[in-house]
Amino acid sequence: SVIRTMKSIEDSDFEIPGEFRAILRGYQKTGFRWLKTLDACGFGGILADDMGLGKTIQVISLLYDEQKAEEKKPSLIICPASMVYNWESEFERFAPSIKVCMVAGTAPEREAAISHLAECDVAVTSYDLLKRDIALYQKQQFRYQVIDEAQYIKNPMTQGARAVKAIQSECRFALTGTPVENRLSELWSIFDYLMPGFLYTYDKFKKRYESPIVKDQDEEALGRLQRMTAPFILRRLKSDVLKEL
């Protein structure tokens, strides 16, 4: 039934927030509804649109919509250091009413920012700083957790990947233009962050999917994996949405 829900996203009754109706393109409105549908069903997902198709604004529209929730909790965005201030300026541009807290700067500045997260709507930090500050986040509970350039956690054994997975959040999303760059274990690691256990332990995943697909070119195993993960990955290419650009 989840799959059925996912397939009827175009007709879903999630209203696009008024401020975004004129800004979002058609496929971005579908993206907003897709994120809302996954959240409502208790799942996370990978927004894997091509570069330049506005993954950021689709997430901002989701976070803006959360403003009307009765019990508000802050959300957390984790991205490469080079993108931190890009996120800040996109919020200022599209949703200036959202109170954004930048967890950056010196260690004391970051500690002060983290201790005041309850006063913010959204916190933004980098993978590197999250890794250093992870102990300070232990008491924090987030509504949404969004990782940008999710290939940063493609190796599940790194401190960065472990830090991201240690954060407590109600709903998790990942943004990436390349869900799998080189190895299927990268996809496993992103799903291990989104919905731990959904693709089993890594050993079991390797036995069931990775080894048969990579070593034996097993089409049936590949088909099973695609069917299992498809509802949780939304990827549009520029060529798919040319007429809307």
Task: Please report, for each region that a protein language model flagged, where it lies by residue.
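ASCE P-loop NTPase motor core, strongest for the SF2 helicase catalytic module
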Residues: 2-217, 224-245
